[in-house]
Amino acid sequence: MKKETELNLLTNENLKTFILAGNSFFTVLNEITGNRFTFRVRKAGWGTSNVKSNIFYVSVLTGSDNESSYVFLGSFFSDKGFYNHSLKSKISSSATSNKVVDWFFQSYFNNPNHFNMIKVYHSGKCGKCGKKLTTPESIKSGLGPYCGGRN
C-alpha cells in the first residue's frame, strides 16, 4: 500500500466503532500474502426511519469504481457477532472474498491483537456520514468530529 495510507490504518481500539458506524468502507490487507479486499458495511435501513441497530449489510469491491462497484455478500448481526452469507448474493459462499469477510467477523473482529499480519485501513471518509476526514483525530478514528462525538 502507498505510504500515505498508513495514516488511514485503523487501530484495534477504533476498529469496531468505525466498522459499525453505519456506512464504512475499509480494506483488509494480509501483509504476508499481499492479498487485500475492500468492503463496505452499511447499517440496515441506513438513510431511512427504519434503521435496524444490529443488522449490517456487507459488500465487496469488485470493479474499478471505489464508490459504487460493490456487490452484496451477506449480513453481519452485531448483537450475535455473527456473519451470514446471503443466498441472494451474486458471489458464491466459496469465493475468497466471502471467506475473508467471514473470517474477519468470526475471528479477527473480536481478537485483532492475535493477528499482527492483518492491517485494516479506512477509506479516508467518515464511516458514518461519508465526509472527507481532515482533522488528525478524525483520520485516526475513521469518524468525523461530529459523528465521533468529539464536538
For every predicted segment, state its role.
Residues 22-24, 74, 142-144:
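Glycine-centered flexibility motif
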